[in-house]
Amino acid sequence: MSLIGRLNLGRRFCTAVPRRSEDIMSNPDCRPSDLCLRVSYLIRCVGDLDTAAKYARLAVFTSIKSESTTTICQSIIGGMLRDKRLKDAYDLYEFFFNQHNLRPNSHCWNYIIESGFQQGLVNDALHFHHRCINSGQVHDYPSDDSFRILTKGLVHSGRLDQAEAFLRGRTVNRTTYPDHVAYNNLIRGFLDLGNFKKANLVLGEFKRLFLIALSETKDDLHHSNYENRVAFLMATFMEYWFKQGKQVEAMECYNRCVLSNRLLVCAETGNALLKVLLKYGEKKNAWALYHELLDKNGTGKGCLDSDTIKIMVDECFDMGWFSEAMETYKKARPKNDYLSDKYIITRFCENRMLSEAESVFVDSLADDFGYIDVNTYKTMIDAYVKAGRIHDAIKTSNKMIDATLKEVSHLF
């Protein structure tokens, strides 16, 4: 039996598990919010999953089972699965939810199902999904993310009919909006098989269901989202036409859904369009769209996110436009609070542009509100060593130790 097949959804008594927090570590602090911060720090900033797992196990002994308690479980299970440590992830799932009867959230179940698909265990993943529904433990399962994972996994496995049935079953309620990413998975699956007619029917079904839900709910926010969601799907049709060598048809899709409508593109849709335009040589249109997103960001008329900026900076690096990469980054950086300097520092180091990386790194150190994680320090240390600047490598290493000790003293 596979690991995922062994997971239970019911409580199971086992004597070989810790019964007190002191069985895990001495003098434990089991306050949920503080424990959550520690686990998150160990996963994201240090990358020490083993120590994070040790602290995460204390979650079962928190006096108040809050949202933070569930987030701890979600974070460590997700971290283990991203690191391909499947047995450790499943052992933690068993420990939290079966041996100690904590209540999972939809993210925990989604992680397990996604890992099943990634291993090719389609039937096991589907069986686990159905058991999750039947258990009734989580009120918001299946979520939008659940359907995205299910449709992607089923399409990848060649089970397009099953994926379509999942989506059809979800939208029986007239007030339920169809999810554009899940529908895009199905559309892409049919287009990859060359079945344009069926893909077009799925697009039409998405539009029909969206408009029905809109008429029932009278939701102004979703009304403004409708054209963006359709444009997101049209990016997949654009790529289909480009692959066929039919540039005119591809750009007709773009003109029809964006230019002729003067669509104020959201970040998610913009990113999908930018990737296709750049991939198939429509660079002038891509840069025009990017500058429109940049100009309208923060005005309430349009937006970009950190991925938008990375797409265009990556394009500069791919073309060998290094000064333009820095200029693009610097212009966009003040308009996005979530873009980490780690990204541009890493890209400069990858391209042996140590002086440029050092410039951004020094600015980050001087920023009182900035935060540099351990991996960014390590990137700079490696770059200094490769350049033969051992003194700078040692100095940066000492700064990393000081910053880490300061952070640890606050958290632990």
UniProtKB/Swiss-Prot annotation:
PPR repeat residue intervals: 69-104, 105-139, 143-178, 179-213, 230-264, 266-296, 305-339, 344-371, 373-407
* This protein's record includes keyword Repeat: yes
Gene Ontology terms: biological process: response to oxidative stress
**One of the record's GO cellular component terms:** mitochondrion
Give a yes or no for keyword Transmembrane helix in this entry: no
Organelle transit peptide: 1-18
Q: Where is this gene product found?
A: Mitochondrion
InterPro entries the record matches: Pentatricopeptide_rpt (IPR002885), PPR_domain-containing (IPR052308), TPR-like_helical_dom_sf (IPR011990)
* Protein keywords: Mitochondrion, Repeat, Transit peptide
Protein family membership: Belongs to the PPR family. P subfamily.
**What is the designated name of this protein?**
Pentatricopeptide repeat-containing protein At3g60980, mitochondrial
Species for this entry: Arabidopsis thaliana
